[in-house]
């Protein structure tokens, strides 16, 4: 209570003198401290506030911070470790990062700045308790500064207390601490702007963890064999708890961080250097350290990933085990169930969980971190079906709850999609995709397209579109065309329509045989540099078949949905997106004019000429430029005929 009075009504200098006096009392009265120490941490933490600490300077210039930390240090040394640990866990689990900042008065700020200036030159000998890491800490977001300072002190406090708890079963107290940390992370992860800080202090806590050896009073009367068994069991359980905490933190603290593991791999494939601005080196470095630490705890990442892949496949295969799976009604229902099953499975698994299992999302993230750390794949090969099931499992749950939205995880599963399409022969990939159930293929392509269109970073979006394009190239021709057509017809997002229409244009122009054909011709020319009378004549080859062939039905289908698009764009309430889609259609028709039906092109040309004249919108000018090009081609063809 007196803490509250001092903290609310006294000046900074008076608070510093009070804390110094309190520290002296704690040091002089260890017996009393052991009795009442559990009640002090909450009051001490209240001195960590923006009215007491200037968040814009390093903590080494704050005597108040030093005094509070020394008080915690004294509590850790002479307080009752079990009672103090219980208090610390309660404080950690209830600590919140509040996103709204409260402004301090000018008088308080001036008082605070004067105190910092007056004492800055006299505190060198007082700061031994402040480590260099926290002493020079300045939060990226000032809202997080005070909560981060509190959580740092509590972590250090708990770490010291765990070294003093006298018990045969230290895992009991470690479990209590890890549970509190997990609750803190779960509660505050959305407010964390600086994942590196919490990752670092959890890493330090885990790697520095060292339980006290039980005293003779606890071991007396227990045989050596029993003690060894207790020790071995405890050691194994402590490793599980630390691994569980580490993998959980990797999974949750990185959920708002882009990761970019897929971009790193893609740039490597393209023989391009990754832009340093795209990579958060400090976060990647701590991720690499986590990977090393987790694997040092007898966690076999390769086995865990393989198990995760098998489990992911079984989640979706279970849909077909329904006795009604062959009925038409169920086939319609299954298209919706494929989006829901991952979320339902996750909820059921959490409810039924009895053993300590590693966070599966964290396992997937660490499997991708293995590549960024070592430059090699944890699994040298992964089949495309497994990668697709993994992608669906890790992305669809976010449709039903935002707690499963995880950017780093999405980057990791896209990375495995890239691996599956680059480390396996094209023939095997095509066969596997052909055997994939239709409802899985559709849901996968729709999720990948939706996530791509929602991506805010243009470079990341380009990488994702390239991945989608590659997968559509590898899909059966009818599957790819049907997906693109259905997207153009039914998808409510214009950005998605523009993306797939660009892909369709490329797939109707480009051919998988073209590259191989060019290489073959070049090789023949090298072997036969001269065209002599004895030369073997080269038979003319058929024109290469594009990824998607153009026929009357497909031309008519695209023509129909283009007219639907034009009709929407003619309305007074049209958006810029509507005009951009019209422009994309015009680019499509201009690019394919040599392959398209002349009569259909004439109708398109006439519709644009009549409906999209005028000025004021820049897209109209580009639409008419494309239409003029189309008109010139039509006129030329009519003259030739």
Swiss-Prot record:
The keyword Ribosomal protein does not apply. GO terms for biological process: cellular response to oxidative stress; mitotic spindle organization. Present with 3900 molecules/cell in log phase SD medium. Belongs to the YBP1 family. It is found in: Cytoplasm. PANTHER family: YAP1-BINDING PROTEIN 1-RELATED. Involved in oxidative stress response and redox homeostasis. Required for hydrogen peroxide-induced activation of YAP1. Acts in a parallele pathway to YBP1. This is YAP1-binding protein 2. InterPro entries: YAP-bd/ALF4/Glomulin, YBP1/2.
